[in-house]
Amino acid sequence: MNHRDRARGCLLGLAAGDALGAPAENMTPEQIIARWGRLTEIEGGGTDDTEYAIFAASLLLRHGHALTPADVAAAYRSEIIPLMTGPMRGAGFSELGTVQALRRGLEPPLTGRVHAHGWSDGLAMRAAPYGIFCPGDPAEAARLVEQDGLVSGDGEGILGGRAVAGAVAAAMAGARPREVADAALAVIPADSWTARAIVRAREVLGDISGTAGQSTAGQGTAGQSTAGDGIPGDLGRRLHEAVVVRHYPWTDVAPEAVALALAAFLAGEGDVEASVTFGVGLGRDADTIGAIAGAMSGAFQGEAGVPRRWAERIGPATGKCLPVVKGRHVLDVADELAKGR
């Protein structure tokens, strides 16, 4: 499997996970089961996750390894803000706060600190292109995504992006699922909220003792559905207990979204459909969890790993959130990243 194939699988998996999870955003697993039973079919288009990933890729194609926060801020000012003729539909809190800060004349890193949402998963959702750009080099992928993150996030929000970029970089080089999770942990502090959430999720799966990927996928017992049937069941409940901040009203919390996405990837043994359906079935920020799980598993399995029926539902970006990316298709973007690294 070559780099282009993995790049296409990564961004196609991201877009599919985003679109599949969009209707379930902010729902609980119980609500999802009551409405769909199991979410397996894409009903509509993607969200800001896909559009921001395309925008992040454009930054890499323009600046490569020399990317700086100043470059990212300049792109916001020249490509995003001038085209905002109304509300920034579907954008996350951190990105909305960043636009407001830039309009006030602030510069990074203050643009990511002045608002109250630096911990959001806005960077994690768009981190995959950095992993594509740095196959086999999680540390460099994490360094690059942080340059982007300093404009819109802070603290755990940046660490969540680093973890995803590192994981995708490892998957792009053919690392096995457990090694992908190890790569995510290797590029963030062990005592961070994000790292602790990932470790707790792995413990729930039994991955620390080496049982995840052997007994969790498709071998559910009564009352305990697993990744094989796409319904989290008791495993999902235990993952929620381990990492979800139940008392907080918003669901776009980077440490929990990243940990749940990695858990879905591990439970699905890197299979795109198993990982994504399990991830979106966890609810919460379901589109972002699905997008991250799809990016990791797509990088691991390549383009052929993305179900054909999903791939056929992914069209050019609508530009609903970011008009600058309207008409861009993730497969074209993936090809450009594969050539431009």
What kind of region is each of these model predictions?
Residues 1-341:
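Structured, active/binding-site neighborhoods that engage oxygen-rich ligands
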